[in-house]
Structures are given as structure tokens and as C-alpha cells.
């Protein structure tokens, strides 16, 4: 049995979505920008969307899987005030407190 490595990414935010094409070679991200972000998936990594806000990256090489997940996360890192953006599934985001009057 071959060991596979998984990396789950959650997209948090109203209207933020992810999808792939039929072959799974291109990842489409709608992250609140005026355009859709297209990411070419590396051949050694397989990407699929379990839900519109949950991305699963899998592959045989742990370094390549986590590197691609980091590239996806860098498209929209989590905000420090509201927490919107892309984050790892078990990641804890420390939010800042807003202004006080």
C-alpha cells in the first residue's frame, strides 16, 4: 500500500469559491477580486474540491503537496480582523481586536 499525503484548505468568506476543471489540472478560485484566479496544478499533485469552500491537495511527495497548498493559500491569506481568506483546515487564526471608542 502506498502512502499518500493530504492537505486540506478551507475558504472562509461570503462568495469565496473554488472549483477545478474536468481533468483536475486547473484550480479556479473566486476570492472577491474582479477576476477569477487560475492556478496550474503540478503533475505530481492531485487537487479536487469536496465542497465549494473546501480544497483537498493530495500526492505522493509531501514537500510538493504542501508547497502547492502554500501557493494556493498565498492567493488570499486570512485577514487579521475578520478571518476571511484561505487557511489550512486545523489552523488557528488569532484575530486582532478592533478600535475602541
From Swiss-Prot:
One biological process term in Gene Ontology: translation
SUPFAM superfamilies in the record: Ribosomal protein L6
PROSITE patterns per UniProt: RIBOSOMAL_L6_1
Protein localization: Mitochondrion
GO cellular component: mitochondrion; ribonucleoprotein complex; ribosome
GO function term, MF aspect, one: structural constituent of ribosome
Primary residence: mitochondrion
Pfam families for the chain: Ribosomal_L6
InterPro entries to which the protein is assigned, alphabetical: Ribosomal_uL6-like, Ribosomal_uL6-like_a/b-dom_sf, Ribosomal_uL6_a/b-dom, Ribosomal_uL6_bac-type, Ribosomal_uL6_CS
Keyword annotations from UniProtKB, A to Z: Mitochondrion, Ribonucleoprotein, Ribosomal protein
Similarity comment: Belongs to the universal ribosomal protein uL6 family.
Protein name as it appears in the record: Large ribosomal subunit protein uL6m
Annotated source species: Marchantia polymorpha (Common liverwort)
UniProt gene name: RPL6
